[in-house]
């Protein structure tokens, strides 16, 4: 399939620059997975589409204040570093701006030496592997020195960094938020539990793939970057029980979806496991894990439009997006949501 088949027209004015005052007041487009029927609701109405015995799966990753501004030690030149993925111990995959002059052996200083980053490997497209040197706990240093890494299409400064975290964010390690989860409030989650709907958590740390567009014409030639994921025994047991009893698994976000489908593909059931996934879901993929999907509206020609198209159909998704544009839904990270069920 050609990447152009996943394009759609989006006025720039519909790209949400700030979150709404109340998380669950976002609009919700409900799409019939098979029928293509469309309903227009508000996000808090999502509970009416969930049934007793269903399990809602949330990604509990936490976004790190991973954008750092510092100096190249040798020259004093200014440099920006976006930490993306922990490779092992204190070695991180990062994006640098400008990257061209940062070579293996060069050191960057942040916060007058509170964090020193040494380049140990050069990657393509501005990527580097950096070894970090610091005292104490890294997260404390990042909270002191770093900024929240908002997506490039958000031009306005975020007044409250917590609005780019889900209310249940726990496991620090992401370079971007799992944005479908931003719509949930603690109160809505309590109401969902009270209805007899299970809530389960997985972790997938959102990394480099989120920032990279598809650069090939034929989507079969696209290579996904790997992201770290983890599922606990408690979550695995709950999901297997949900399937066994004939209830539905509703995935919140494409990150949860990729984790669940990776595990079902590799093990034929849900198991306690951690690892790296580069799963690429596009039309022709057979879903084995999820029965419903809550997600935001994604960038034209992105792998995420392909993922949701594989769950419903390309025609249904592009028709729903066209309707959302017509009715001036808010798009992307701080935008409105879609339930495909």
Curated annotation (Swiss-Prot):
Molecular function in Gene Ontology: S-adenosylmethionine:tRNA ribosyltransferase-isomerase activity
Q: What is its EC number?
A: 2.4.99.17
**Coiled-coil annotated residue ranges, if any:** none
Instruction: Give the InterPro entries listed for this entry.
Output: QueA, QueA_dom1, QueA_dom2, QueA_sf
Q: Which UniProt keywords apply?
A: Cytoplasm, Queuosine biosynthesis, S-adenosyl-L-methionine, Transferase
Which pathway does UniProt place it in?
tRNA modification; tRNA-queuosine biosynthesis
Q: What does the UniProt entry say about where the protein is found? A: Cytoplasm
Catalytic activity annotation: 7-aminomethyl-7-carbaguanosine(34) in tRNA + S-adenosyl-L-methionine = epoxyqueuosine(34) in tRNA + adenine + L-methionine + 2 H(+)
**Which EC class does it fall in?**
transferase
| One of the GO biological process terms | tRNA wobble guanine modification
In the UniProt record, the signal sequence range is none
State what this protein does.
Answer: Transfers and isomerizes the ribose moiety from AdoMet to the 7-aminomethyl group of 7-deazaguanine (preQ1-tRNA) to give epoxyqueuosine (oQ-tRNA).
Family membership noted in the UniProt record: Belongs to the QueA family.
Q: How does it assemble?
A: Monomer.
Q: Which NCBIfam families match?
A: PRK00147.1 (NF001140), queA (TIGR00113)
Q: What is this protein called?
A: S-adenosylmethionine:tRNA ribosyltransferase-isomerase
Q: Which organism is it from?
A: Staphylococcus haemolyticus (strain JCSC1435)
């Amino acid at each position: 399939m050609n990447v152009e088949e996943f394009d759609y027209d989006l006025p720039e004015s519909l790209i949400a620059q700030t979150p709404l005052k109340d998380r669950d007041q976002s609009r919700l487009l409900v799409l019939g997975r098979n029928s293509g029927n469309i309903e227009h609701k508000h996000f808090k109405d999502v509970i009416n589409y969930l049934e007793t015995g269903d399990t809602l799966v949330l990604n509990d990753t936490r976004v790190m204040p991973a954008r750092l501004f510092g100096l190249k030690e040798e020259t004093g030149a200014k440099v920006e570093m976006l930490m993306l993925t922990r490779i092992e111990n204190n070695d991180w995959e990062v994006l640098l701006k400008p990257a061209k002059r940062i070579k293996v052996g060069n050191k960057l200083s942040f916060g007058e030496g509170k964090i020193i980053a040494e380049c140990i490997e050069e990657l393509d497209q501005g990527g580097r592997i950096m070894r970090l040197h610091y005292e104490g706990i890294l997260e404390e240093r990042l909270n002191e020195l770093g900024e929240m890494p908002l997506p490039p299409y958000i031009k306005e400064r975020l007044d409250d960094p917590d609005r780019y975290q889900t209310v249940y964010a726990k496991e620090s390690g992401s370079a971007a938020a799992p944005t479908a989860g931003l719509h949930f409030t603690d109160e809505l989650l309590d109401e969902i539990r009270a209805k007899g709907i299970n809530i389960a958590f997985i972790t997938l740390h959102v990394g480099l793939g989120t920032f990279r567009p598809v650069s090939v014409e034929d989507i079969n030639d696209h290579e996904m970057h790997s992201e770290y994921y983890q599922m606990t025994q408690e979550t695995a047991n709950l999901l297997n029980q949900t399937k066994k009893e004939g209830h539905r698994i509703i995935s919140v976000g494409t990150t949860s979806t990729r984790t669940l489908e990776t595990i079902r593909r590799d093990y034929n059931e849900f198991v306690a496991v951690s690892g790296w996934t580069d799963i690429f879901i596009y039309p022709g993929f057979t879903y084995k894990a999820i029965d419903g999907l809550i997600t935001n509206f994604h960038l034209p020609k992105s792998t995420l439009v392909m993922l949701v198209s594989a769950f419903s159909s390309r025609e249904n998704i592009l028709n729903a997006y066209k309707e959302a544009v017509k009715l001036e839904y808010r798009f992307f990270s701080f935008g409105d949501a879609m339930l495909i069920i």
